[in-house]
Amino acid sequence: MRAIICKDWGDPDTLELGELPEPALGPGQVRIRMRAAGVNFADCVLVRGQYQEKPDLPFAPGLEGAGEVMEVGDGVTDFKPGDRVMAVVSAGAYAEQAVCEATTVFHIPDGMDNMTAAAFPVAYGTSHLALVHRAKLKAGETLLVLGAGGGVGLTAIECGKALGATVIAAASTAEKLELARARGADHLINYAEEDLRGTLKKITDGQGVDVVYDPVGGALAQTAMRSL
């Protein structure tokens, strides 16, 4: 099958177009004919050999994608050949075919195209897991999103608003904050120009925030945590 191939650890510009064997299908897995694949920062880390998982070389990177189910392994009952799906893949979405666990495959809703679906699972899945399952964010609570202009930050804003929270978006430029405003953020903080903790006190009348969502882990992490 045709694939974008990582033959040695390095930057993304070292990837090559070539041929790889079709991946084997095991029990509980789904084979997908990939029509589109997402591009994430984690993909760059993966091909540099710095990710938490390190596939054997050579391999096709790509942690998420969308397409149609080709076949399913033993024990899979939620999907059948022809279903339109999006999926999180341990690696391999940058290929004509990918095999992944059925538990990381999702039906594509009617009206969503493959390009949109391919970029959905990682960013939105990260925010949904963090806010719904970990933080258990509730309606009426206040959510602070750091790095709010990035892909994961923007999805956190959308998830926060969908859950009924007041969302404070913090980013380093006016352009990024405009993106955050367009996604529904209630308050904006440019932490390159404003004191984050002081501005948070003003916005919350000194009460602080209920949840901090920090996809960056940078210098402002401690300041944000002290505002809880």
PLM region spans:
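Short, well-ordered loop/turn sites that connect or cap secondary structure elements
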Residues: 79-80, 137, 228
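Glycine-rich cofactor phosphate-binding loops and adjacent beta1-alpha1 units
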Residues: 183, 187-228
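Mid-domain Rossmann-like dinucleotide-binding core that forms the NAD(H)/NADP(H) cofactor-binding site
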Residues: 119-194
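Glycine-rich beta-strand-centered segment in the early N-terminal region that forms part
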Residues: 21-39, 50-92
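Cytochrome P450 core scaffold surrounding the K-helix E-X-X-R motif
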Residues: 42-48
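NAD(P)H dinucleotide-binding glycine-rich loop of Rossmann-like/cofactor-binding domains
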Residues: 33, 45, 56, 84-147
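Terminal peptide-recognition signature
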Residues: 3, 34, 98, 127, ...
